[in-house]
Amino acid sequence: MYQLTLPDKSIKEVASGFTYRDFIEKELPFLKNKALAVRLNGEEILDLSRTVEKNSNIEVLTYSEKLGWETFQHSAAHLLGMAVQNLYKNANLTVGPVIDNGPGFFYYDIDFQGAIVTPEDFPKIEAEMEKIVKADHPVWRKVVSKKQAIETFQKLGEKYKIEIIDGIPSEEVSIYGMGEWFDLCRGPHVPNSGVLKSFKLTAISGAYWKADKNNSMLTRIYGVAFPTKKELDQYLFQIEEAKKRDHRKIGKEMDLFSFQKEGPGFPFWHPKGTILWNSLAEYLRSECNKRGYQEIKTPAVLSSELWKKSGHWDNFHENMYFTDIDEEDYALKPMNCPGCSLIYKHHLHSYRELPLRFAEFGSVHRHELHGVLHGLFRVRAFTQDDSHIYAPLDYLESEVMDIIDFTFTVYKKFGFSEFKTFIATRPEKSQGKDEDWEFATSTLKQSLEKKGIPYGIKEGEGAFYGPKIEFNIKDSIGRLWQCGTIQVDFSMPERFDLDYTDSDGQKKRPVMIHRAIYGSLERFIGILIEHYEGKFPLWISPNQIRILTVTEKVTDYAKNVYRELLDSGFRVELDTRNEKIGAKIRDSILKKANYLLILGEKEMESNTLAVRMRGQEDTKILTRTGFISNLQDEIKSS
């Protein structure tokens, strides 16, 4: 008999010879149709068909857990591989990983040996995938020696698999299959092909084997997979909506920002975009002031010795930009925290002045490969709404709880109402003592629990210096965006020898909390553009009001209205072009102005305004003072 301990600490006994699937069907029947794999002792992930062979802590992985989702997507990649080889007998498979960002959730790189495959072939491949799903093949696993595996794949002419096997250090490899088809894989996989009910091939591109242009050019086919058709349909709806809402397209139409060939990955903010950028910064600055934050600014270029001291040199070197000044190495800052810590260290500190909260709109530069750049979502230069809080250890929980409240206040201001929260734990590449990591992680969990906020765990995805809370916001079409973070750091205060004098006169080490709510202003603006489809609420809109003249006779009246609105603090544009009013209206709709004032001789004679609200076709006649009062009320209530 073996003992399996569930997450709720209950212990179940399992007879020898039972598989994990047998165990779930007997002890956890409500999960039998959802279970995809199991994780033992927080580390080892196994197929449900594996036999229970030891006492373990066990987690059942379903599609809703990240590891279960990855198992599902990778199994769908195998489904694609099998379908392709059923249809294209000479096709050679290479690798088929799961991805977080891209035109799909998985892909398979395939050498079609001269056959041309295009998106027009997707229906044929999907039909073959459907046949495999309907056959409901059990997924089998076999462990063989490397020699056996090489001989097997040599007979099939699978040269890429042989190359992969040659690079595996262990003497045994695992093979997974469905029916007579099989593939080299370490697993795990779903229990049977029938689980993979809903899928879609989404894109195709070229890719070099091992990303080396001297190697063979392969065909990369992307796809997504879901447990139900409803979830797939929702995803496909999101994709179509996302195309309409693409912030790059809307940003161009509204003249918010651009990217230039002279600086790929570096945004150029146009006047309207700068208004939007400043609106976000000013709002957060005012909220920080209410909460006792002190704003600072740190240099963009600092000595490489600083980055070695902070640990960024070892952990972030490949993403940094370097320069030489007076024959010494310097770097553009990729993060703001070391500079902030130098400001803290510049003065002596007493326990009476802690917690000390510094805030900075800090511009950082990080090298990203050209191929992953994506509008405002993935750039090489951006501004973080960074805050670094230095506090005694016994203040950690209360500070974290205050930041949680602050974070949700900001998100709700922008119209977000649904959230998902995660705790990201210690990665393999990290710094600091085990006990500090355990204490910090426990404190983050307790803070969320006391606030009644449910959370998931992202194993090994914390920063190199500490665990973090990640805040995900759900936008208007149901997509989740990871934005804010709260990160606990014991490492940097140690590295910079930061201290304060406690009530007993002794020097103590503060804990450091890194906090960002937007994450970066650039990315958050990109999210807002797509969330609102460019139709911003009045208080942040860069195009609040456009005044359109019907005839040249009303130009002076329009200018008078324009000046009054400017003096009242509104963002106004005046269009007196000698164009038909219909053309002016169409142009204003494209720019997504909140209000159009259509002024003709009638409005001039009555000293009124014909007001057309965004998204409506009718106009209302308002007095000038009445319109201004309405705008002020709208902004106050937002």
From Swiss-Prot:
GO terms, molecular function: ATP binding; metal ion binding; threonine-tRNA ligase activity; tRNA binding
Keywords: Aminoacyl-tRNA synthetase, ATP-binding, Cytoplasm, Ligase, Metal-binding, Nucleotide-binding, Protein biosynthesis, RNA-binding, tRNA-binding, Zinc
Domain named TGS: residues: 1-62
SUPFAM superfamilies for this protein: Class II aaRS ABD-related (SSF52954), Class II aaRS and biotin synthetases (SSF55681), TGS-like (SSF81271), ThrRS/AlaRS common domain (SSF55186)
InterPro entries assigned: aa-tRNA-synt_IIb (IPR002314), aa-tRNA-synth_II (IPR006195), aa-tRNA-synth_II/BPL/LPL (IPR045864), Anticodon-bd (IPR004154), Anticodon-bd_dom_sf (IPR036621), Beta-grasp_dom_sf (IPR012675), TGS (IPR004095), TGS-like (IPR012676)
GO term, biological process aspect, one: threonyl-tRNA aminoacylation
Region annotation Catalytic: where it falls in the sequence: 246-537
Cofactor(s) the protein needs: Zn(2+)
Cofactor: binding comment: Binds 1 zinc ion per subunit.
GO CC annotation: cytoplasm
PROSITE patterns hit by this protein: AA_TRNA_LIGASE_II, TGS
Subcellular location: Cytoplasm
Protein's job: Catalyzes the attachment of threonine to tRNA(Thr) in a two-step reaction: L-threonine is first activated by ATP to form Thr-AMP and then transferred to the acceptor end of tRNA(Thr). Also edits incorrectly charged L-seryl-tRNA(Thr).
Protein name per Swiss-Prot or TrEMBL: Threonine--tRNA ligase
Species this protein is from: Leptospira interrogans serogroup Icterohaemorrhagiae serovar copenhageni (strain Fiocruz L1-130)
